[in-house]
């Protein structure tokens, strides 16, 4: 996503399949201390609301048999510590609304507000508007867990999208699946966990001017196709500091991101420029100056995207560790680079399997400072422009990459050849990574 693309994220009145399924699920259950009566009172009065596609918004919403019909009805009642349990069914936007779920109420550090699938259920948020889920204007301490967000790409033809490429107020070709927008007031402490996000003509998970965002164990595919705003599967744009912490604050981990691509030319450049898997972009000069926190991009699988699999662009303090990128650069207008940093500073790129096309350039070093590539694996025939002395050239021996299975066979050249990265304790499937036997790539 490029700087000029911001206006396309929020417009109008309310503007704002996985091929191989892992069993690991992300969890952020808070272990609460109870030091005083005030906190005891807060915990004891936390409410669980229930939502069902067959419910009624005139119900009380506090039992499965008295569930609300819309998620928004429950969201508008939430207080710190509350949980919204969403049951099976399809939840769609009203014709005059810019989102299905607009989250406006915040939790606290010790009492997050959670929106999650009811156990054993698979609710679907379907929309043809600006976003399926939106969080904006300083919202904080929110968790979105286990939902499926589906856009309207299946009902939009490429011919129609081309006819609308200069009509920027059309949500049918510009809608995002999940939008976090902190440009007015910094949004912070948001967890996006275990969701399936797909078929949105704009971005998949789009994060703008936010801090402390965790995107973990999501599956993001078939997004970014029809918008002229330079979207990608997962994008963190204009990162903004909520505090002065210099450690890890943004986490993009354990996600599966594929088949995101741009078919409509980018507005300003009049060319295909984006449609990649994961991008951290333009964080050197946000609204509070350059972002000072670190971003960890780890254990992701990014493949068959139109643009690059993973890129840090005009961003500082990013660690890209133990990812698998494969077969990206599907758009013929773009290079075949799989993983790169450009115009960035203080970026470490370690332990990644970077698998592109024979004879094609797989990485790039574009006017960077203090960017280190090392302990990465490249297949034979790949053109590595920048590397490290501990790099491995060999066959990763994926089990079945054509089916999206990037686990490693026992003879893989990646096994036990990685660098110990203390903050990456498990792999993409939740398997522990032994300190003395770190394997390159998303799988241990």
Where are these regions (language model features)?
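Residues in short coils/turns that link rungs of repeat/solenoid architectures in beta-rich domains
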Residues: 93, 151, 156, 199, ...
């Amino acid at each position: 996503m490029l700087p000029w693309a911001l206006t396309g994220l929020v417009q109008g009145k309310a503007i704002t399949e996985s091929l191989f399924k892992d069993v690991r699920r992300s969890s952020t259950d808070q272990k609460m201390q109870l030091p005083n009566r005030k906190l005891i009172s807060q915990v004891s009065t936390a409410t669980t609301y229930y939502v069902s596609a067959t419910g009624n918004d005139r119900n009380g919403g506090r039992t499965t048999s008295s569930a609300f019909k819309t998620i928004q009805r429950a969201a508008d009642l939430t207080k710190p510590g509350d949980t919204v349990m969403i049951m099976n069914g399809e939840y769609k936007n009203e014709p005059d609304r810019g989102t299905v779920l607009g989250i406006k109420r915040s939790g606290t550090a010790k009492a997050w507000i959670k929106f999650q699938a009811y156990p054993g259920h698979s609710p679907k948020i379907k929309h043809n508007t600006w976003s399926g889920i939106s969080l904006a204007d300083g919202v904080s301490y929110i968790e979105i867990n286990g939902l499926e967000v589906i856009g309207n790409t299946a009902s939009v033809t490429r011919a129609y999208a081309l006819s609308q490429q200069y009509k920027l107020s059309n949500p049918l070709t510009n809608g995002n699946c999940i939008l976090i927008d902190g440009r007015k007031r910094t949004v912070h402490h948001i967890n996006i966990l275990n969701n399936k996000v797909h078929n949105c003509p704009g971005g998949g998970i789009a994060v703008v001017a936010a801090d402390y965002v965790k995107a973990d164990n999501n599956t993001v595919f078939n997004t970014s196709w029809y918008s002229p705003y330079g979207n990608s599967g997962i994008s963190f744009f204009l990162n903004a500091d909520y505090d002065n912490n210099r450690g890890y604050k943004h986490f993009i981990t354990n996600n599966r991101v594929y088949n995101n691509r741009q078919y409509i030319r980018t507005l300003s450049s009049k060319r295909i420029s984006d449609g990649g898997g994961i991008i951290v972009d333009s964080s050197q000069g946000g609204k509070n100056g350059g972002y000072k926190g670190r971003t960890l991009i780890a254990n992701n699988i990014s493949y068959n995207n139109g643009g690059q699999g993973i890129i840090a662009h005009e961003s500082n303090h990013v660690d890209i560790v133990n990812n698998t990128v494969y077969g990206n650069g599907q758009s013929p207008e773009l290079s075949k680079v799989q993983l790169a940093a450009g115009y960035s500073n203080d970026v470490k790129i370690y332990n990644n399997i970077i698998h592109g096309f024979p004879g094609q350039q797989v990485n790039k070093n574009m006017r960077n400072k203090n960017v280190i590539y090392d302990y990465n694996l490249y297949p034979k025939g790949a053109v590595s422009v920048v590397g490290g002395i501990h790099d491995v050239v060999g066959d990763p021996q994926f089990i079945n990459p054509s089916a999206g299975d990037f686990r490693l066979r026992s003879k893989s050249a990646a096994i036990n050849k990685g660098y110990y990265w203390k903050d990456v304790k498990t792999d993409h499937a939740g398997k522990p990574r032994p300190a003395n036997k770190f394997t390159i790539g998303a799988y241990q």
